[in-house]
Design a protein with these regions (language model features):
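Subtilisin-like serine protease catalytic core
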Residues: 68-79, 85-99, 107-155, 224, ...
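Structural recognition of the beta-strand scaffold that forms the well-ordered cores
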Residues: 78-83, 135-140, 170, 175-180, ...
Length: 360
């Protein structure tokens, strides 16, 4: 997430084409893990600086007030968030259903703690969360802001490896796993953890990165079946900071997001594909609530068939197109085949369909 100097948030512009349709959406090896959080400058205090819980532009962009009025709140769905510790004392998370399911505990720095807390806010905040009634399980893993690995290194074994945490989330009953950090791990442990998640119908989401380049080789989205998410601006254009690659499946609003500078406590705004990934995870949570009888494969088919690129054509920047949250809850996925549409990614990916079948 890149924190930048921005004025108070405005209502998103409702442009024609892709941006207009998106804005109308909900009305009709572990040590290599790197969490990219760059603070550039402080933002001025916004109109909501004195409020305990600031407003968020994505809430109006995706018309989440209308979603809540229709009963789309994620009730009955469990999300797993893999990242740093979450500060559940944050006012925006008051009343949220969050359980720390970590296999061990780390000591994170202020940037990492703020980042993870912001992701939880996007997912399940009763005030500005996409899926306020969903259950959130959090799993701690180290990042480049980690100050101590705490209890996570035991006898030479890393208890917080991405593969172990994905397997743990699957075992704990999560239906959606979201990861807003780079994961350059290419181990067999992670490969088979992804296969395990797919075979159990668990959907995995991963941010594309914020380096404005092809980051496919350093992202979890390089693996078969994982939804890579890039960022768009509020006018629907591809965000200049967003990374891309063969693992990208969709895109979503990447900011501004109203947050707090972790070093000073001052109001700040942030942008990044971490925000986009959390929004996609939240909207897929609403789809799983709305369509409980659909298979996870059909939910994935729904995502790619309703994404907003013309004819849903795929490209490295936005995948099949920006997510259309409205279509996810208004289009019956039972019309689509029970086949995972993102197993064989462009350029090839692992595990293969046969490996997943053999694993099962």
């Amino acid at each position: 997430v890149v924190t930048t100097h921005k004025p108070a948030p405005r209502h998103p512009r409702m442009c024609a084409g892709v941006a207009g349709r998106a804005a109308r959406a909900l009305t009709t090896a572990v040590s290599a893990l790197a969490l990219a959080i760059g603070v550039l400058t402080l933002a001025p205090a916004s109109a909501h600086a004195d409020d305990a819980v600031p407003s968020q532009e994505y809430f109006s962009y995706y018309h989440l007030d209308a979603a809540r009025q229709k009963g789309y709140t994620g009730k009955g769905v469990t999300i797993a968030f893999i990242g740093g510790p979450v500060d559940t004392s944050d006012p925006a998370l008051s009343g949220a259903n969050i359980t720390d399911k970590s296999r061990c505990t780390i000591q994170d720095g202020p940037k990492g703690l703020r980042h993870s807390t912001d992701m939880a806010i996007i997912l399940v905040s009763p005030y500005t969360g996409v899926a306020p009634d969903a259950t959130l399980y959090s799993y701690q893993t180290r990042s480049n802001d980690t100050q101590s690995t705490g209890t996570c290194d035991t006898g030479g074994e890393a208890l917080d490896s991405m593969g172990k945490l994905i397997n743990q989330a699957v075992e704990d009953g999560a239906q959606i796993i979201t990861v807003s950090m780079a994961v350059p791990d290419t181990s067999d442990e992670l490969k088979w953890a992804v296969a395990n998640a797919i075979s159990h119908g668990v959907i995995i989401i991963n941010s594309a990165g914020n380096s404005a380049r092809d980051e496919n080789s350093t992202q979890l989205a390089r693996w078969s079946g994982v939804i890579g998410v890039s960022a768009i601006n509020s006018d629907g254009t591809f965000a200049s900071y967003s990374s891309w690659g063969n693992g990208v499946v969709t895109a979503a609003f990447g900011g501004p997001f109203n947050t707090i500078n972790p070093d000073t406590g001052a109001s700040a705004t942030a942008r990044g594909t971490s925000i986009s990934a959390a929004l996609v995870a939240g909207m897929l949570t609403l789809a799983r609530q709305k369509w409980p009888n659909a298979t996870p494969n059909q939910i994935l088919q729904l995502l790619v068939h309703t994404a907003l690129n013309p004819n849903h054509d795929w490209n490295q920047q936005t995948g099949y197109g920006p997510i259309d949250g409205g279509a996810l809850v208004n289009t019956d996925p039972s019309q689509y085949p029970d086949e995972n549409p993102i197993i064989d990614k462009p350029g090839g990916s692992s595990p293969t369909a046969k490996e997943i079948q053999d694993f099962t």
